[in-house]
A protein has these predicted regions:
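Acidic beta-strand-to-loop metal/phosphate-binding motif
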Residues: 1, 10, 196-198, 235-247
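Non-catalytic accessory segments of DNA primases and related replication-initiation nucleases
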Residues: 1-116, 120
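Short acidic-hydrophobic sequence patches enriched in Asp/Glu that either
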Residues: 5, 20, 179, 223, ...
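Short beta->alpha connector loops at strand-helix junctions that form conserved
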Residues: 13, 218-221, 242-244
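Short secondary-structure capping/turn micro-motifs that flank functional sites
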Residues: 30, 93-95, 124, 224-225, ...
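Residue-level marker of alpha-helix boundaries and capping positions
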Residues: 63-65, 95, 195-196, 218, ...
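Phosphate-handling DNA/RNA-contact segment within nucleic-acid enzymes
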Residues: 98-238
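Acidic, metal-coordinating catalytic cores used for nucleic-acid/nucleotide bond scission
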Residues: 203, 223, 243-249
Length: 249
């Protein structure tokens, strides 16, 4: 590859789209006009388990948002111009408080997921005393998807003036910050003849998307070579629109 790595076409698609071998195989088969539905594929058990866990968590966050505990969040999002279509399109949710997180963990355990599974995907972390702490609390939750549309991580925005304002999932087996872009699937839908817009934050992407603009975010201000390669796999032209603060400059 141009980046100096070695591999075949499957490795390339897996790297660029941050997807599993099975998903890369299906994507290439579709591109080549081969019907892959008549074949069965053995997925990596660890990856399959983590994707199922994150999907389940994302569904729980969405339920929280539309429950009584999410009323304040819904009002905030409505004030920001995020309507029900955008909520559904970007699968936006709410992590809730400690009690709702404890309830979620108990449900996940009943469904066969272990605490180690939750630590591995970045939902729970351990402090120096080995006590388990919920990574996301009382945050607007925006799932980060791979190019197959599967949840691989989350971005959480705090309500009010707390710090940090945005909190991304830690790096995991599924999620590599130096490769992942936010909003790729929606940007491709809106691309047509419009130029791709690269911005900093989730809310920027969601706002631009609501007006029909193809936008993605780099999950921070630092663009890596992997990000740039992924960007030009989406579009030949792109505008860089970062914030006007010191970090954005």
């Amino acid at each position: 590859f141009g980046c100096g790595k070695n591999g075949d076409i499957f490795n390339y698609v897996m790297e660029m789209d941050n997807i599993s071998f099975v998903d890369a195989l299906k994507k290439l088969a579709q591109y080549a006009g081969i019907n892959h539905n008549s074949y069965t594929f053995a997925e990596d058990p660890k990856q399959k388990n983590q994707l199922q866990l994150l999907k389940r968590v994302s569904e729980s966050y969405i339920k929280n948002l539309h429950a009584p505990i999410g009323e304040k969040v819904r009002n905030y999002l409505k004030h920001r111009g995020i309507d029900n279509f955008l909520l559904e399109n970007f699968k936006i949710g709410y992590s809730g408080n400690i009690k709702s997180n404890e309830f979620l963990v108990s449900c996940l355990k009943k469904e066969g997921f272990s605490m180690n599974d939750m630590i591995d995907v970045g939902l729970v972390k351990q402090n120096p005393q080995k006590k388990n702490i919920f990574y996301f609390q009382q945050r607007i939750m925006i799932p980060i998807l791979n190019n197959s549309g599967k949840v691989i991580a989350f971005g959480g925005r705090i309500l009010g003036d707390g710090s940090p304002k945005y909190l991304n999932s830690p790096e995991t087996f599924l999620f590599k910050k130096n490769k992942q872009l936010f909003g790729v699937l929606n940007a491709k839908k809106n691309l047509n003849k419009k130029r791709l817009i690269i911005c900093e934050g989730y809310m920027d992407v969601i706002s631009l998307s609501s007006h029909g603009y193809p936008a993605i975010a780099s999950l921070g201000t630092a663009l890596t070579d992997n990000h740039i390669e992924n960007i030009f796999n989406i579009s030949d032209e792109a505008f860089l629109v970062f914030d006007g603060d010191a970090a954005g400059k």
